[in-house]
Amino acid sequence: MDPAQNQPNTEPPAAPAVEEAQGVNNSEAEAPAPAALSSVSPANPPITAVPEATAPTTSQESTIPGAGYKLISTIEGHTKSISAVKFSPCGKFLGTSSADKTVKIWNMSDLSCERTLTGHKLGVNDFAWSADSKSIVTASDDKTLKIYEVPTVKMAKTLKGHTNYVFCCNFNPQSSLVVSGSFDESVRIWDVRTGMCVKTLPAHSDPVSAVSFNRDGSLITSGSYDGLVRIWDTANGQCVKTLVDDENPPVAFVKFSPNGKYILSSNLDNTLKLWDFGKGKTLKQYQGHENNKYCIFANFSVTGGKWIISGSEDCKIYVWNLQTKEVVQSLEGHTQAVIASDCHPMQNMIASGALEPDNTIRIWRSDS
């Protein structure tokens, strides 16, 4: 499913607000639709490694004193909407996925494309790196996940079991398990070694938009268009907590904070919420961006200042002060909705990706 049509068929309502954290897609579908990046392709195309040069460019960004991010490069290479951008845990690579059915791996030293992972029959909605940066798992509209060995560009396993678009995925910190969420409304847990599904959680009553492990892998959080954020015990598959406000707009994204104590959720009512999930309460709410159509990634940035980062449907990337909730910067340069973003694990750097016809990845850096 192409991110450019990843939107619900209901109009989400507005939500409420209130302390400390550390730190897409397009197809004709029955479901309301966060999802994927479909387009028809030959069955099982070969996996290829395609080196590509990229041309850095510059652009404008509007700055409110605080974060100091500036555009340093624009990367081109994908032919359709960007669905996800993620730095490798080692910080040496940037992965990007797209409706064009591929994942590309860019070397951060010169922004050259080192590898292109192919094999999916339809668009790739999401992907995740293993902890050692040597494997990638992908989630696709073709209802499968695939695990690739990055150094050899080898497709190691295909994970089958979901009955609708696979929209989101993540490795646990030990890289022994993969969690996935789907338009079939389920969350599945997979054994990486065998490629078998070890648990199927009847998680939600609408498509699952995001899944994430906590820092030790003992818990999973999932978000859905049913408006719920749920926390699951990884070992037994039991739901240990459901987070919901008085208003429950569709949940577009969820992620544990780096210290594992909080959950950041993105909601289709133009808000981000920081939850103390132990107490089941919203601590903070971040506003100012536009998000009522697409599943947009949000991030904690803890390498410099403590920021919350998110793309926006107004073609910008927004940076909030985590504690004060103020917008400290908005980054301009993309020409379409920015649904993908990530923060570098060691440097004050952001990667962002936009819908078609923009199709670009942009790299932003702060020297503050």
Swiss-Prot record:
Residues 1-64 are annotated as: Disordered. Residues 16-42 have a biased composition (Low complexity). GO terms for molecular function: histone binding; RNA polymerase II-specific DNA-binding transcription factor binding. It holds the Pfam family Beta-prop_WDR5. GO terms for cellular component: cytoplasm; MLL3/4 complex; Set1C/COMPASS complex. Coiled coil: none annotated. SMART domains: WD40. InterPro entries: G-protein_beta_WD-40_rep, WD40/YVTN_repeat-like_dom_sf, WD40_repeat_CS, WD40_repeat_dom_sf, WD40_rpt. WD repeats lie at residues 77-116, 119-158, 161-200, 203-242, 246-285, 288-330, 333-368. The keyword Repeat applies. Signal peptide: none annotated. Keywords: Repeat, WD repeat. GO terms for biological process: determination of adult lifespan; programmed cell death; transdifferentiation. PANTHER family: WD REPEAT DOMAIN 5B (PTHR22847:SF637), WD40 REPEAT PROTEIN (PTHR22847). This is WD repeat-containing protein wdr-5.1. It comes from Caenorhabditis briggsae.
